[in-house]
Amino acid sequence: VEKHGINSHLRQKGKIAELALGYGGSIGALKSMGALDMGLTEDDLQPLVDAWRMSNPFITKFWWDIDRAVKSTITQRIQNEVRGINFMYKSGMLFIRLPSGRLLSYVKPKIGENKFGGESVTYEGIGATKKWERIESYGPKFVENIVQAVSRDILCYAMRTLSHCFIVGHVHDELII
């Protein structure tokens, strides 16, 4: 979809679908991002979720590969690797080693049951209420954490590479020079 082309009116809908569905979101995520306010109906939402997932098989496979790696690392206390991302359990912590070598850390992870009756991972951290609590997660959410962290690492690399420039600031993934 071209930004100012014939079908540019579809751009915002596509952007919402990417942001809502890219990390495992479904109908609820689409609604919370304003899909119904953009003219989509309730009946449009599940087919949109299904179509997005069918159109992005490598992303959805990556979600569940990460999910399996996290769960087996926690339950079997073994190291795992998925596409250059390493998972290890040590001293009551789940560590995810990024390609940069930086570690993401999850405190006291364990396997529990989610609200849908399926298996999920929980760990301790600061939740939405700003209090220390158990936080539920799963493959797509871990992928979101990994992608955001790798993006930060790339931005930092770019900032070091451009150290000869006067960097005024940065917003999301853009540097202001």
Predicted features along the sequence, with ranges:
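Conserved catalytic core of nucleotide polymerization and phosphodiester-bond processing enzymes
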Residues: 1-177
